Amino acid sequence: MSTENTLSVADLARENVRNLVPYQSARRLGGNGDVWLNANEFPTAVEFQLTQQTLNRYPECQPKAVIENYAQYAGVKPEQVLVSRGADEGIELVIRAFCEPGKDAILYCPPTYGMYSVSAETIGVERRTVPALENWQLDLQGISDNLDGTKVVFVCSPNNPTGQLINPQDLRTLLELTRGKAIVVADEAYIEFCPQATLTGWLVEYPHLVILRTLSKAFALAGLRCGFTLANEEVINLLLKVIAPYPLSTPVADIAAQALCPQGINAMRDRVAQTVQERQYLVNALQQTACVEHVFDSETNYILARFTASSSVFKSLWDQGIILRDQNKQPSLSGCLRITVGTRQENQRVIDALRAEPV
């Protein structure tokens, strides 16, 4: 047998996958901490009891109780809801449904969430960036100049990692600019911390608007991997063509339905109030800490701050078992670290450690 033309496994892989730098999730970055403030999770676990034991049967593709409960919570019709393995799968589904690899592009506005880029690159879709303005609002002219060939525009509001809301008038202008040209995806992963800012009421006006949601943040279920896509029925039907046949396991659907019952939603709102209170405590303390240059406003469960020596601060806290998220390499975020709001005890440990840093 000739071996002249044999290829290695790496050679057999698609070129874009060989060159791909995977998303550096908080867990992938690792660390041996006991204070985990790097992934925007809720700091304590919520207990659930499984009520569905029929694990010998395949689950529903779109579990009825989960869809109906979420639709009622979000104020939309069940036909406007799709549930998936986290909002990350929703990102991928939209790109797969609307973008032709090698032809179409997505557009996003850094500094922002990294999975828009990674998902597009994995699928083989061009990525275009229009950096946010100095105040981290949208550069509408820059976006307008890049719409030819762009099929999907991703906007995160509140934005991760900066924490601020996108100006609603700018969002409306964006939706008008893209009408008949591109899908606009509003990532509302953190909307429970500022529910008044949701765009769900705009779905009736904009057939090309898609909204991403998750149970990972305010619902304290990051380990469940359950997210939602809200859109008009025509969009949902297209996404249903490309989603896996059984995206949610029976236990995940069981717990999600419980979390979305009235009692679960009330508990979520209590957690939000607790988080907002702790966020203010942390902001006040950071503003009185010598190694902190600036604390940015936040509408979320995390705070972005600029430090006089962020790399050494990050490593020093890491060595003490306090794991933060380094944002230094993001555009316009030099010297910045992101701190998830933890328990009072965790927040105090962060402040004590920061105040012990040499200035």
From Swiss-Prot:
InterPro entries: Aminotrans_II_pyridoxalP_BS, Aminotransferase_I/II_large, HisP_aminotrans, PyrdxlP-dep_Trfase, PyrdxlP-dep_Trfase_major, PyrdxlP-dep_Trfase_small. PROSITE patterns: AA_TRANSFER_CLASS_2 (PS00599). Keywords: Amino-acid biosynthesis, Aminotransferase, Histidine biosynthesis, Pyridoxal phosphate, Transferase. Disulfide bonds: none annotated. It catalyses: L-histidinol phosphate + 2-oxoglutarate = 3-(imidazol-4-yl)-2-oxopropyl phosphate + L-glutamate. Homodimer. This is Histidinol-phosphate aminotransferase. The lineage of its organism: Bacteria, Pseudomonadati, Pseudomonadota, Gammaproteobacteria, Enterobacterales. The gene is hisC.
